[in-house]
């Protein structure tokens, strides 16, 4: 079990007093954290951290040419052994939060319940959890058999999630539920489950398959939270922290085989970045954007790119001003953006050339990962592929998500 820690921006583990006690993976049990009074061994201390992981191509919006170069190098290095830094991005649902408050009471809820105003969304019993869901929308969901079944499923797993936590643990885990009951085994001898958009198959005669067989419910955890909802990185060993077999907290599932990188595509991308770097950085210069009162320009570019998932990702940038006219961006800011782009046409054209090229290289890599024979297979409506992958990087993790397939299917779901 891990000691009480926080994780600094330099990835150094610190104790409650702020004293450095090592880096992840190098904790020495003989080194006791210094504290003014005895502290709970399982208590998790948080430092506010940025939760969003950027798509490989979107890094350019915030980091300019340096971000483009980082994305390029990250993708190229996957062929050179860095594929071991890539893990499956699980598509779970619903998003849940579970843990214990300062009084030691166990709570299981969802994101809305955790921050609820006007009602107590931090359910402390199976019955309270089911009623919380059924009472939403004025109780209309009580007449929907599917929703009633969902509420009962949540009720039935409450005790399992309570019992999987050490009794002295204080804090919360945020994650996505993968299944309520042990998944069935299909004709190909794979466990099969579909928590949301993606259907997953896990080879039964694998280590993960053995863990699934022993479990009742499965979850993938992403972050830890404190009572105020402040998020931080996971600071416990997921393989040893949780108790019993009923709840399987899925460990990071690493990609097993390196992709073959298209050197011609990489070379073209490198040349495009080099040719446009000065103009690109001028277009995205934060000081300039602040002066023009359009510091949120990168967020607007991100929103536009996301919208193109619905209409097609070809010719990115060509219909930006048509899109922005129908957006929530004010008329005054729209005019400023137009004038700024007209003054930086080379950077504007280069931006979308780079974004499209990164996306193309990324999608080719994703397709290779999806086609490899692996213990975990994923598909959407019968077509190979899932939510994608996450590439660990010291300057910020990178999402490798197939926007044209998963993102489009996910955005089309009515919730």
Question: Residues of each region from the PLM?
Answer:
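Intrinsically disordered, compositionally biased, charge-dense segments
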Residues: 1-47
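Core nucleotide-handling region used for phosphoryl-transfer chemistry
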Residues: 45-84, 89-94, 98-415
